Amino acid sequence: MTHSKRWLEEHEKDPYVKRAKKEGYPSRAAYKLLEIHQKYKLFKPSMNVIDLGAAPGGWSQVAKDLVGPKGVVIAIDLLPIQSMLDVIFIQGDFNEPEIFNQLEAIVAKKTLTGQVDLVISDMAPNISGIKNVDQSRSLHLVELAWDCAQKLLARGGTFLVKVFQGPGVDRFLINLRPYFNQVKFLKPSASRSRSSEIYILAGEFLGYNQRV
């Protein structure tokens, strides 16, 4: 059996995939975020949130449900996402100055401080099947997400990002720790056990220019 056929069979049998279809989420990834929230209380009503690499939209949908009508969720991705009531969507690469400026302008317009309480990212690279290549690309996306977060995250805010385990992750964590009071690795049960994906949860942002 080829890798693709094996993946399709597992995908069709996956209980989270079946649950997502039943409950109206665009992907099983929603349950990873819900599980993390249930344990760490990421979201509060009226929060302002940026979802980087938001397609197909599951995390944005969860975020909007949890921050409520007074909260703001800004989703950004190169790919389109399903239309969601009250989620602001930007299609483009947030690493491009023009798109980042658009993101920054929306944050300034929609928040009192020009900053957000939470930056989340479930981004993954296009998978090549070559483990070290995919892991390196994943780490690069994490670094881009952090570069964006440090510019728009309010003091006391939270940064949640997915990464594939491998070289450079521990070094990234060492570099990240001075900017937050709490940094930890997470592996939600909704993540497939054979997947190398983990999540970095960094809480109580100290401010980019105020690190200890």
From Swiss-Prot:
Coiled coil ranges: none
Active site as annotated: K162
Places the protein is found: Cytoplasm
Binding site for S-adenosyl-L-methionine: G57, W59, D77, D93, D122
Pfam families listed in its UniProt record: FtsJ
InterPro entries: RNA_methyltr_RlmE, RNA_MeTrfase_FtsJ_dom, rRNA-MeTfrase_E, SAM-dependent_MTases_sf
Protein's name according to its UniProt entry: Ribosomal RNA large subunit methyltransferase E
Organism (species): Coxiella burnetii (strain CbuK_Q154)
Organism classification: Bacteria, Pseudomonadati, Pseudomonadota, Gammaproteobacteria, Legionellales
